Amino acid sequence: IVELVLTDHPMECDSCEVNNNCELQTVANDLGISDHRYNSPKQHKGIPRDTSHDYMRMNLDNCINCGRCVRACDEIQGSFVLTMSGRGFESKITTDNDMMFGDSSCVSCGACAHTCPTDAISDVFQSKSAAVDKKVRTTCSYCGVGCNLEASIKDDKVVAIDTPKETEVNAGHTCIKGRYAFSFYDHPDRLKTPLIKRNGKFEEASWDEA
């Protein structure tokens, strides 16, 4: 079965964005499969890369039609943006009304990119493959839900956000703010010290005072 899946997937792992962090590559390596014995179909070859989305990229040349992105969009986010169109060798992932990804009704939660086993759908921050110094478990501060996040740190700055699947609060899911709006963490206008109003003016205070 894995060999058949690989007939429709480029065997160019070394140049792939998610090299060494690809579920398909991991399964193939575990089974000792580095090539396939079948003629390669052409249903996913030569499809233009869709870079119209602000946060995600769609590269259907690397899609294996597993359908996980469709289920994540439907069952986790409830947006129903992605679907499997066509039949047989003509099957492929499309957005609503076959629009460009950036023109679709996508709410940018990133669930599709997070669950994709290859880099058919990935985000612009390369959250699945970024070379980082460390990863730190934290809690999103945008709202009161308290989604558990994993921040990828490089040179003391957050460069990507992941959502661990085993977390109880959000079970590996979050919204656009939690996943992609992390630039505010280092924004110069962000309040990092408690303020107390004294004599009509806000003054910095200690955490104990606050």
Show which residues each predicted segment covers.
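N-terminal export/assembly segments and adjacent metallocofactor-ligating motifs
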Residues: 2-8, 17-210
